[in-house]
């Protein structure tokens, strides 16, 4: 790993108050995306109150993927990092409400929960899987349901992807990220494994999170 790589930990409850508040509000008002409000009480009752078609008809290019200009990051819907985790019964309608308002790009990760976030997102997106772009992330190992360090060995990546595909109820992940660099595994090994998964149809593209330009160039050289 390059000396310039930063290894920011996945945030927990001791994150800054302003960021915690932002993420809490995002989970509560996710379907509205600034166009309406979803109250705590309405979420608890399984209903949403929001209006407007915030991004319908608009799009951006992300490589050869076409996505809405606003995506929905689903982390705080279940992880408890910035607010108490919520149930699939509460969050599936929020995700589907975002779809109704033109959002087509959704982000999750195996570490969110862990695992429960992908279950929620998979359930919500299953009816419209071919109409949306799905991003998820890997790169950690787990012990008794808790994050226990990083692991991006090729065998670990392959095992993680099989679990992700099952939880997300899909046969491919459109954008597959390495969540954090594993200092014990050359990034070339990661890129090579991701490239194999793309060739096998289990992923369409891969990305790297929080890496230096040097690390990014090494990965790109291995699998452009």
Feature names for model-found ranges:
Residues 1-18:
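N-terminal secretory signal peptides
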Residues 45-73:
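N-terminal amphipathic alpha-helix/helix-capping segment at the start of soluble metabolic enzymes
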Residues 144-224:
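Glycine/proline-rich, positively charged
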Residues 108-124:
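Glycine-rich, proline-tolerant flexible connector loops at the mouths of alpha/beta enzymes
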Residues 67-71, 105, 131-135, 172-175, ...:
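Structural preference for beta-strand elements that scaffold enzyme active sites
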Residues 64-66, 122-129, 166-169, 220-224:
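Acidic (Asp/Glu)-rich catalytic clusters
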Residues 16-21, 32-52:
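N-terminal twin-arginine translocation
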Residues 63-81, 135-148, 177:
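N-terminal small/glycine-rich loop or linker at the start of catalytic domains
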């Amino acid at each position: 790993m390059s000396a310039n790589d930063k290894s920011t930990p996945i945030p927990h409850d001791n994150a800054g108050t302003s960021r915690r508040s932002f993420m809490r509000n995002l989970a509560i008002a996710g379907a509205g995306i600034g166009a309406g409000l979803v109250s705590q009480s309405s979420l608890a009752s399984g209903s949403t109150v929001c209006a407007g078609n915030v991004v319908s008809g608009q799009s951006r290019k992300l490589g050869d993927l076409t996505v809405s200009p606003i995506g929905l990051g689903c982390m705080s819907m279940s992880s408890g990092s910035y607010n108490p985790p919520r149930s699939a019964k509460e969050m599936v309608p929020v995700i589907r409400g975002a779809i109704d308002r033109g959002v087509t790009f959704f982000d999750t990760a195996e570490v969110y929960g862990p695992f429960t976030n992908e279950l929620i997102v998979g359930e919500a997106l299953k009816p419209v899987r071919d109409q949306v772009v799905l991003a998820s992330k890997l790169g950690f190992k787990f012990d008794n349901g808790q994050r226990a360090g990083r692991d991006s060995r090729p065998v670990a990546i392959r095992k993680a992807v099989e679990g992700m595909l099952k939880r997300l109820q899909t046969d491919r992940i459109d954008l597959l990220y390495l969540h954090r660099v594993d200092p014990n595994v050359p990034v070339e090994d990661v890129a090579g494994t991701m490239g194999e998964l793309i060739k096998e149809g289990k992923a369409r593209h891969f990305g790297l999170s929080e890496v230096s330009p040097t690390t990014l160039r090494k990965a790109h050289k291995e699998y452009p």
